[in-house]
Swiss-Prot record:
A motif (PRPP-binding) lies at residues 99-111. It comes from the Bacteria. CDD domains: PRTases_typeI. GO terms for molecular function: uracil phosphoribosyltransferase activity. Keywords: Glycosyltransferase, Transcription, Transcription regulation, Transferase. This is Bifunctional protein PyrR. HAMAP family: PyrR. The lineage of its organism: Bacteria, Bacillati, Chloroflexota, Chloroflexia, Chloroflexales. It catalyses: UMP + diphosphate = 5-phospho-alpha-D-ribose 1-diphosphate + uracil.
């Protein structure tokens, strides 16, 4: 695996998520109207971890949901006719709330655009914010994250891979060189 380079360790991921949790609290003047919504698949455990960090320092549990954007993607035809659709589960009404979308990597912005469309079908939030663990640049759409764990400039031939304990058995972020197939 010589084409892999670790850019975040487990402890660095933990610290980034705790910092993001504090920033969400500070920017919103409290958490009473905040809902975290993880974009499937790795955004969901990240949203859960941010909620756990908030519970640790605020003593309150922020609602956490999960959002499947499969049917909202503009590249659905490229992924083939058998695209698997997962459950969207947002445990509270989002109308009038601050929804913080959570994802692992911000790249072109197309995933976030699809998530915005999906959220619009669920209600009318007062505002929507975006939290990402990694922002790697190369935007194709005018989208910017409100909360970023780490900015990682990359080339288009590189791929950022987030591995999480919940899905991969280990916490780390690596860059794979010369293997971008997104």
């Amino acid at each position: 695996m010589s084409n892999e380079k670790q850019i975040l360790s487990a402890d660095e991921i933990r610290r980034a998520l705790v910092r993001i949790a504090h920033e969400i609290d500070e920017r919103n003047g409290g958490l009473q109207h905040v809902v975290l919504v993880g974009i499937r698949s790795r955004g969901v455990p990240l949203a859960e971890r941010i909620a756990a960090a908030i519970a640790d320092f605020e003593g309150t549990r922020v609602p956490v949901g999960q959002l499947d954007i499969t049917l909202y993607r503009d590249d659905l035809k490229l992924r083939g006719p058998a695209a698997r659709v997962y459950k969207t589960d947002v445990p509270t009404d989002i109308t009038g709330k601050t929804v913080v979308l959570v994802d692992d990597v911000l790249f072109t912005g197309r995933t976030v655009r699809a998530a915005l469309d999906a959220i619009a079908d669920l209600g009318r939030p007062a505002r929507i914010q975006l939290a990402v663990l990694i922002d790697r640049g190369h935007r194709e759409l005018p989208i910017r994250a409100d909360y970023v764990g780490k900015n990682v400039p990359t080339s288009l031939s590189e791929r950022v891979k987030v591995r999480l304990r919940e899905t991969d058995g280990v916490d780390e972020v690596v860059i794979l060189r010369g293997t971008n197939n997104d």
